[in-house]
Amino acid sequence: MFRSALVRSSASAKQSLLRRSFSSGSVPERKVAILGAAGGIGQPLALLMKLNPLVSSLSLYDIANTPGVAADVGHINTRSQVVGYMGDDNLAKALEGADLVIIPAGVPRKPGMTRDDLFNINAGIVKNLWSAIAKYCPHALVNMISNPVNSTVPIAAEIFKKAGMYDEKKLFGVTTLDVVRVKTSYAGKANVPVAEVNVPAIVGHAGVTILPLFSQATPQAILSGDALTVTTKRTQDGGTEVEEAKAGKGSATLSMAYAGALFADACLKGLNGVPDVVECSYVQSTITELPFFASKVRLGKNGVEEVLDLGPLSDFEKEGLEALRPGIKSTIEKGVKFANQ
C-alpha cells in the first residue's frame, strides 16, 4: 500500500513539475555540474537534481567518494544521465559543456561558528574551483552555495575578471534558503497556508545581513512589532538553530539542498525561455551603493535579465537596511582582498 501510494505521489509530482516547465518533447539538453557532490549538501542536492526533468546530464564532482554517489543516484529512473568525477585531474571533464554549475563545496558550519569563521578554508577551496570554471565552462551560470556567500561571490567575480571571462549576469549567490525559512516562519505567525506564501529576503546571506521584507509578503498579514522582530531573528538564526538541534553533528544540509534545487530549477527555466521567473539572489547590483546585494532578480536566457527595485519599505525595514550596510560592505571587501592576494 505504501509503495503504491508513493508511486502515485511521485508520478503526480513529476507530471506537475513537467507541466510547470515544458512538455518532455520540448525540453532542451542541459548539463548541470555539482561541485562538492559527495558532501552533506551535495548528496541530497544530487538526488533532487536527478529528479528534475529539465536536466539531461548530471555531472557530480568531489575530491573523494563521488563514484559511489553517482552510482547510487544513477539508478533512479529519470531523464538525466549521471557521471561521477573524483579528484583534481577530473575537474575539467566534470565542467566541460556545463550550462549550470552549483557549488556546495567546502566545510560545514559547526556550533559556535559563524559563516565568516569558515572564510579561510572555504575561500581557498572556492578560489580553485572558480579558476577551473573560468577555463572550462566560462559561459555557464554558476550558483554559489559555499559560505560565506557574502564573500565567496565577490571572490568569484574577481577571479573571472582576471581571466577576462566575467559576466555579472551569470554569477549568483544562492540565498533561497533565507526565503524558504522566512516563508515557513511567516506562515506560522500569520496563520496562512505556507504554500501560498511569498516573502522576499534581501541584503546578504549571513546571519544579521539577512533582511526579510514582510511589508511585501503575500498574502498580507499585519504582524506586531514583536512578531516582526522574532520572525526576522529566527530567519537570521536559522542555521544556528539546526546546528544546535543536531548537537554538533551536522548543519542545515537537507533544507539547503532543497533551496539549492529550487534556485537551480529557476535558473534552468530562465535558460529555457520560461517568462517571468523571479527569485531572490545575491548578485552584482546597482540598486544600492553596495556592489553586491541580495534582492529579487528576473532570470532569463542570459542569466540575470533584470535586478528588480526594492520597492516600498516599511520603517522597520528601512532601519534594518541601514543597520546592515556596514556589515555586508566589509564582507564584500574581505572577498575582493582575498581574491587579489
Curated annotation (Swiss-Prot):
GO terms for molecular function: L-malate dehydrogenase (NAD+) activity. The gene is MDH. Substrate binds at residues 109, 115, 147, 181. Keywords: Mitochondrion, NAD, Oxidoreductase, Transit peptide, Tricarboxylic acid cycle. Its EC number is 1.1.1.37. This is Malate dehydrogenase, mitochondrial. The keyword Acetylation does not apply. Homodimer. It catalyses: (S)-malate + NAD(+) = oxaloacetate + NADH + H(+). The lineage of its organism: Eukaryota, Viridiplantae, Streptophyta, Embryophyta, Tracheophyta.
